Amino acid sequence: MYPPKEFFGAARNIEEGGSLTIIATVLVDTNSRMDEVIFEEFKGTGNMELHLSRRMAERRVFPAIDIDRSSTRREDLLLGDKTAQRTFLMRRMFGQLIAPQPQGAGYELTQAMEAFLNRFNRTKSNDEFLQSLVS
Protein backbone atom coordinates (compact mmCIF):
# COMPACT_ATOMS: atom_id res chain seq x y z
CA MET A 1 0.00 0.00 0.00
CA TYR A 2 2.88 2.38 0.65
CA PRO A 3 3.93 3.23 -2.98
CA PRO A 4 0.38 4.09 -4.16
CA LYS A 5 -0.32 6.06 -0.99
CA GLU A 6 2.94 7.98 -1.48
CA PHE A 7 1.93 8.74 -5.08
CA PHE A 8 -1.47 10.12 -4.06
CA GLY A 9 0.17 12.11 -1.29
CA ALA A 10 2.39 13.80 -3.91
CA ALA A 11 -0.36 16.33 -4.59
CA ARG A 12 0.57 17.99 -1.30
CA ASN A 13 4.34 17.90 -1.77
CA ILE A 14 5.09 20.03 -4.82
CA GLU A 15 8.46 21.78 -4.69
CA GLU A 16 8.18 25.58 -4.49
CA GLY A 17 4.44 25.53 -3.87
CA GLY A 18 1.88 25.20 -6.59
CA SER A 19 -0.52 22.32 -6.68
CA LEU A 20 -1.04 19.00 -8.33
CA THR A 21 -4.49 17.56 -8.83
CA ILE A 22 -4.75 13.80 -8.85
CA ILE A 23 -8.08 12.20 -9.61
CA ALA A 24 -8.51 8.62 -8.51
CA THR A 25 -11.54 6.38 -8.58
CA VAL A 26 -12.41 3.40 -6.48
CA LEU A 27 -15.29 0.97 -6.78
CA VAL A 28 -16.97 0.23 -3.46
CA ASP A 29 -20.03 -1.76 -2.41
CA THR A 30 -18.64 -4.77 -4.25
CA ASN A 31 -19.03 -7.11 -1.26
CA SER A 32 -15.26 -7.58 -1.37
CA ARG A 33 -13.56 -7.05 1.96
CA MET A 34 -10.30 -6.25 0.15
CA ASP A 35 -11.96 -3.42 -1.84
CA GLU A 36 -13.28 -1.94 1.42
CA VAL A 37 -9.85 -2.17 3.09
CA ILE A 38 -8.18 -0.46 0.12
CA PHE A 39 -10.86 2.26 0.07
CA GLU A 40 -10.51 2.95 3.80
CA GLU A 41 -6.72 3.06 3.48
CA PHE A 42 -6.79 5.69 0.72
CA LYS A 43 -9.78 7.63 2.04
CA GLY A 44 -7.58 9.75 4.28
CA THR A 45 -5.29 10.90 1.45
CA GLY A 46 -7.95 12.74 -0.55
CA ASN A 47 -9.34 16.23 -0.12
CA MET A 48 -12.69 15.47 -1.69
CA GLU A 49 -14.98 12.48 -1.97
CA LEU A 50 -17.66 12.28 -4.61
CA HIS A 51 -20.04 9.37 -4.14
CA LEU A 52 -22.16 8.43 -7.11
CA SER A 53 -25.46 6.60 -6.72
CA ARG A 54 -26.05 3.55 -8.87
CA ARG A 55 -29.77 3.73 -8.07
CA MET A 56 -30.04 7.34 -9.31
CA ALA A 57 -28.09 6.53 -12.48
CA GLU A 58 -30.32 3.52 -13.16
CA ARG A 59 -33.36 5.78 -12.79
CA ARG A 60 -31.74 8.35 -15.11
CA VAL A 61 -31.52 11.04 -12.41
CA PHE A 62 -28.44 13.11 -13.17
CA PRO A 63 -26.17 14.20 -11.70
CA ALA A 64 -26.27 10.90 -9.80
CA ILE A 65 -24.41 12.37 -6.82
CA ASP A 66 -25.10 11.13 -3.32
CA ILE A 67 -24.98 14.53 -1.60
CA ASP A 68 -25.23 13.01 1.86
CA ARG A 69 -22.06 10.89 1.42
CA SER A 70 -20.04 13.36 -0.71
CA SER A 71 -17.91 16.08 0.83
CA THR A 72 -14.87 18.30 0.54
CA ARG A 73 -12.42 18.56 3.40
CA ARG A 74 -12.29 22.00 4.90
CA GLU A 75 -15.02 23.25 2.61
CA ASP A 76 -15.37 26.19 4.99
CA LEU A 77 -11.95 27.46 3.85
CA LEU A 78 -12.94 27.35 0.17
CA LEU A 79 -16.24 29.17 0.52
CA GLY A 80 -17.06 32.49 2.11
CA ASP A 81 -18.79 32.36 5.50
CA LYS A 82 -22.26 33.04 4.11
CA THR A 83 -21.93 30.48 1.30
CA ALA A 84 -20.43 27.89 3.67
CA GLN A 85 -23.33 28.32 6.12
CA ARG A 86 -25.87 27.96 3.32
CA THR A 87 -24.06 24.90 1.96
CA PHE A 88 -24.11 23.28 5.41
CA LEU A 89 -27.82 24.11 5.63
CA MET A 90 -28.38 22.50 2.22
CA ARG A 91 -26.65 19.32 3.40
CA ARG A 92 -28.73 19.22 6.59
CA MET A 93 -31.93 19.73 4.58
CA PHE A 94 -30.96 16.95 2.19
CA GLY A 95 -30.23 14.71 5.18
CA GLN A 96 -33.69 15.48 6.58
CA LEU A 97 -35.31 14.54 3.28
CA ILE A 98 -33.71 11.08 3.30
CA ALA A 99 -33.99 10.48 7.06
CA PRO A 100 -36.66 7.91 7.95
CA GLN A 101 -39.99 9.13 9.28
CA PRO A 102 -40.97 10.46 11.79
CA GLN A 103 -37.64 12.35 12.22
CA GLY A 104 -37.32 13.07 8.50
CA ALA A 105 -39.37 13.05 5.32
CA GLY A 106 -38.52 9.44 4.49
CA TYR A 107 -37.69 10.13 0.83
CA GLU A 108 -35.69 7.67 -1.20
CA LEU A 109 -32.32 9.10 -2.29
CA THR A 110 -33.63 9.48 -5.86
CA GLN A 111 -36.75 11.34 -4.71
CA ALA A 112 -34.68 13.71 -2.59
CA MET A 113 -32.33 14.50 -5.48
CA GLU A 114 -35.29 15.08 -7.82
CA ALA A 115 -36.78 17.52 -5.27
CA PHE A 116 -33.46 19.38 -5.04
CA LEU A 117 -33.05 19.44 -8.83
CA ASN A 118 -36.60 20.78 -9.31
CA ARG A 119 -35.86 23.61 -6.92
CA PHE A 120 -32.39 24.19 -8.39
CA ASN A 121 -33.75 24.40 -11.94
CA ARG A 122 -36.07 27.23 -10.87
CA THR A 123 -33.09 29.39 -9.90
CA LYS A 124 -30.54 31.18 -12.07
CA SER A 125 -27.40 30.50 -10.03
CA ASN A 126 -25.94 28.42 -7.23
CA ASP A 127 -26.11 31.47 -4.98
CA GLU A 128 -29.79 32.02 -5.74
CA PHE A 129 -30.48 28.33 -5.06
CA LEU A 130 -28.73 28.45 -1.69
CA GLN A 131 -30.55 31.69 -0.83
CA SER A 132 -33.89 30.05 -1.71
CA LEU A 133 -33.24 27.44 0.99
CA VAL A 134 -33.18 30.05 3.75
CA SER A 135 -36.25 31.95 2.58
Feature-to-residue mapping (PLM):
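P-loop NTPase catalytic core
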Residues: M1-S135
